[in-house]
């Protein structure tokens, strides 16, 4: 693979990681990290990050702006599809009944998947639509803060 391409992609990945982390999401990079968080009681929003255009243009901005709300999950975490493969695979084991999809969001409550917002519900939609989908999940499964 071309060295310039690798450098470019490393920069894209780093920017994508920084963007979601600065929004308040904890990076989970190992299967152990995933288990430690998702087995906890309460609600956890998992953002399955990606380098695709709909992740950067829609999903990550929605992940950030949806948090300007009174009803929120107990925890915000992210795994990076294609980068942190072990963590992503383990997270997907919790998403029973849903096909692998990135970018996407999964709301886990007490260690069990409640619902997902899959790529097809993100791609081709605008940021506000995805924010509304997230906040609908928050209203349904989370508590006011």
UniProtKB/Swiss-Prot annotation:
NCBIfam families, A to Z: YphP_YqiW (TIGR04191)
* A matching Pfam family: Disulph_isomer
Q: Which family does it belong to?
A: Belongs to the bacilliredoxin family.
Q: Which GO terms describe its biological process?
A: cell redox homeostasis
Source superkingdom: Bacteria
**Species for this entry:** Staphylococcus aureus (strain NCTC 8325 / PS 47)
Which protein is depicted?
Answer: Bacilliredoxin SAOUHSC_01610
PANTHER family attached to this UniProt entry:
BACILLIREDOXIN BRXB (PTHR40052:SF1), UPF0403 PROTEIN YQIW-RELATED (PTHR40052)
């Amino acid at each position: 693979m071309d060295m310039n391409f690798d450098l470019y992609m490393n920069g894209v990945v780093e920017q994508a990681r920084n963007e979601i982390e600065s929004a308040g999401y904890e990076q989970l990079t190992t299967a152990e990290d995933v288990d430690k968080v998702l087995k906890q009681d309460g609600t956890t929003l998992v953002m399955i990050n990606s380098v695709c255009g709909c992740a950067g243009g829609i999903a990550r901005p929605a992940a950030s702006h949806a948090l300007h709300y009174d009803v929120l999950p107990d925890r915000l975490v992210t795994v990076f599809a294609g980068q942190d493969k072990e963590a992503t695979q383990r997270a997907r084991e919790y998403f029973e009944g849903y096909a692998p999809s990135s970018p996407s969001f999964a709301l886990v409550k007490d260690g069990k998947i409640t619902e997902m917002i899959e790529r097809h519900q993100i791609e081709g939609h605008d940021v506000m639509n995805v924010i509304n989908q997230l906040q609908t999940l928050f209203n349904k499964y989370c508590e006011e803060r």
